[in-house]
A protein has these predicted regions:
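Charged, compositionally biased N-terminal leader segments and the immediate start
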Residues: 1-22
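Accessory alpha-helical DNA-binding modules that contact the DNA backbone or grooves
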Residues: 33-154
């Protein structure tokens, strides 16, 4: 697992936490760590093998907890916090935010209130006229979402 993949996992973790409405300061700490990891010149795997936790903590934004998660990620390909979070909020919910008009709050509403947790679920929801029931989605946003799902002709 390279630095970019590790950074991507922390960006995803922060996004899932944002969807759940977790503490904004915690989200920011994961995003800051991800930004630093993404551009760090030395592979984190190398640092972890040679210097352990202390070496990883030398990276700006990486404290003891995040360094521990990096080591877990390198050893197992995942970490406990990720497993726990994705058990409650599937990773596929992140795909919803790739669509125009759907940010973290709307993704959270779709998932929590309407049990939409993937693009497939959203297509069925939209085809059944579900967007009109979602607070915060007006006609223009609904149209953007339909167009991006290629459902505007239905």
């Amino acid at each position: 697992m390279d630095n970019e993949q590790i950074a991507r996992r922390f960006y995803q973790l922060a996004a899932l936490m944002e969807i759940r409405g977790d503490d904004p300061f915690r989200l920011r700490s994961y995003r800051n760590a991800a930004e630093a990891i993404e551009v760090w010149p030395t592979p984190l795997k190398e640092i972890a093998e040679q210097e352990g936790l202390a070496g990883l903590q030398a990276i700006p934004g990486v404290g003891k907890a995040i360094a521990g998660k990096i080591i877990e990620l390198l050893d197992r390909g995942t970490f406990d916090a990720w497993e726990k979070l994705t058990a409650e909020t599937p990773e596929t919910v992140l795909d919803l935010m790739d669509l125009p008009g759907i940010g973290p709050k709307t993704a959270a509403t779709l998932h929590q209130k309407f049990k939409v947790s993937s693009i497939e679920d959203l297509k069925k929801f939209v085809a059944g006229g579900g967007l009109e029931m979602v607070d915060g989605i007006g006609a223009r946003t609904a149209e953007k979402i339909k167009e991006s799902l290629d459902l505007s002709g239905q």
